[in-house]
Amino acid sequence: MTHITFQAPYSWGRWRWVAMIKFMKKLLSLLFLALMAVSVMAQKNVYKFSVKDGNERTVKLKDYKGKVLLIVNTATKCGFTPQYEALQKLYETYKKQGLVILDFPCNQFGAQAPGTFRDIHSFCTGNYGTTFPQFAKLNVNGRSESPLYTYLKAQQPFKGFDLNSNIGKFLDEKFRAENPAYAKDPSIKWNFTKFLIDRQGRVIDRFEPTADMKDVEAGVKAALKMK
């Protein structure tokens, strides 16, 4: 009588070995990300970071040493998009005193920054006459976020929406429904979040998209007076 023996593709020993390798790879990946985060947090200013311009050329933020920077994640199809007008006015008013606005399109919020850099740049210059530097699209949250934004968020956590405005109330209710403790999370919540950088490259303030532009201007004026 012939006996037929069925053998599992992997013995238990080999299966455990494969599982262990997968676990170690995942652990090493997490450790690598953690070390990167620690390295980013150790920075004392924004000048160690580099970004890409619209032609994917590297731009070092140390090129802006001595300037007051307003770093903004933007979108062209957002309810806050008209803020471009106020940003351009702010830039024209204070650029001779040392203000530079750095515009970073981001498509992470409702896919409201579609298209290529050329599409976005043409929209902004054509509709709002923007003349401040605009950079390549990037991510501000998540595993693929820009190291610059990892640093910015660590230095200035979420400040809260303006609950005196209808849009501020709406956004607060929206995020609170998803996570009651959302305000403790430093992540970028929406388009047109602004970070204010002083002349030494330190992140000194954060303005949520619902912040009054008069408050943003006041912050810029104060930063320009700082030595």
Predicted feature residues:
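Thiol-based oxidoreductase modules, predominantly thioredoxin-like and allied folds used
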Residues: 98-115, 131-142
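Thiol/selenol-based redox catalytic cores and closely related redox-interacting motifs
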Residues: 129-209
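Conserved helix-turn-beta segment immediately C-terminal to the redox Cys motif
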Residues: 67-68, 76-77, 81-105, 124-128
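Non-catalytic, surface beta->alpha helical segment in thiol-disulfide oxidoreductase systems
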Residues: 205-226
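Hydrophobic h-region of N-terminal signal peptides that target proteins for export
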Residues: 33-41
